[in-house]
Amino acid sequence: MEKTRKDVCVPRHVAIIMDGNNRWAKKRLLPGVAGHKAGVDAVRAVIEVCAEAGVEVLTLFAFSSENWQRPADEVSALMELFLVALRREVRKLDENGIRLRIIGDRTRFHPELQAAMREAEAATAGNTRFLLQVAANYGGQWDIVQAAQRLAREVQGGHLAADDISAELLQGCLVTGDQPLPDLCIRTGGEHRISNFLLWQLAYAELYFSDLFWPDFKHAAMRAALADFSKRQRRFGKTSEQVEAEARPSC
């Protein structure tokens, strides 16, 4: 964390579970994909607010490893929307100094979509103002397993002793290993769970739940979440008195 203007404490890394697209559409008697399309506007709004506030990293849970279980026509529509959004939004991201990273297991995606992911990442690779991470075919359990497998290969190859494996080493092998841990995790749609998202990384994150469906979570809602975060005291196992005595930011 760091102090920003007017001594408002802003999270370095915000993670969001974008929930409620289907229910938003159903409420309006629209097909589910209409909710996902409307959700793109909310993504734009949240990026704007976070970048303006001084957030460094925004990670969005776009498609979980469990979402493949949804109806085939819905999954197909989501993949098409993802492809279109990547190609349409990459120029604007680049113009605004935003770097895009896709995290998750890409092997199950169509080669055309995988290529679009690589192209979008390459087009924005030099940007440093803000990092947008999109979690696609991602699961927190998968992330921990692939990190453990990387360490196991190091041990098997004689490059690492098993007793030298630490929490820090494992964390560094996660797909977000080179980024600060999330300070704030937001979930929209009224549900109160993290649904296999960034399981390791969210260990000390502040959780914020909104009843708004994702397409309705825009500028004002994002600012409200950041304002709520700035009022919290993050203790990391210490007492309030210890935190206050250290005279560090209360978030």
Swiss-Prot record:
The cross-references to InterPro entries, in alphabetical order and at most eight, read:
UPP_synth-like (IPR001441), UPP_synth-like_CS (IPR018520), UPP_synth-like_sf (IPR036424)
What one GO molecular function would you report for this record? ditrans,polycis-undecaprenyl-diphosphate synthase [(2E,6E)-farnesyl-diphosphate specific] activity
Enzyme Commission identifier(s): 2.5.1.31
Q: Which UniProt keywords apply?
A: Cell shape, Cell wall biogenesis/degradation, Magnesium, Metal-binding, Peptidoglycan synthesis, Transferase
Q: Which domain of life is it from?
A: Bacteria
Q: Which GO BP terms sit in this record?
A: cell wall organization; peptidoglycan biosynthetic process; polyprenol biosynthetic process; regulation of cell shape
Q: How is the cofactor bound?
A: Binds 2 magnesium ions per subunit.
Active-site annotation: D19, N67 (proton acceptor)
Cofactor(s) the protein needs: Mg(2+)
EC top class named in words:
transferase
User: What is the annotated quaternary arrangement, including any partners?
Assistant: Homodimer.
Instruction: Enumerate the residues binding Mg(2+).
Output: D19, E206
**UniProt function note:** Catalyzes the sequential condensation of isopentenyl diphosphate (IPP) with (2E,6E)-farnesyl diphosphate (E,E-FPP) to yield (2Z,6Z,10Z,14Z,18Z,22Z,26Z,30Z,34E,38E)-undecaprenyl diphosphate (di-trans,octa-cis-UPP). UPP is the precursor of glycosyl carrier lipid in the biosynthesis of bacterial cell wall polysaccharide components such as peptidoglycan and lipopolysaccharide.
Q: Where does substrate bind?
A: 20-24, 36, 64-66, 68, 70, 187, 193-195
Q: What is the designated name of this protein?
A: Ditrans,polycis-undecaprenyl-diphosphate synthase ((2E,6E)-farnesyl-diphosphate specific)
Key word S-adenosyl-L-methionine present: no
Reaction(s) catalysed by this chain, per the record, are: 8 isopentenyl diphosphate + (2E,6E)-farnesyl diphosphate = di-trans,octa-cis-undecaprenyl diphosphate + 8 diphosphate
What cellular component GO annotations does this protein have? Answer: cytosol
Q: Which family does it belong to?
A: Belongs to the UPP synthase family.
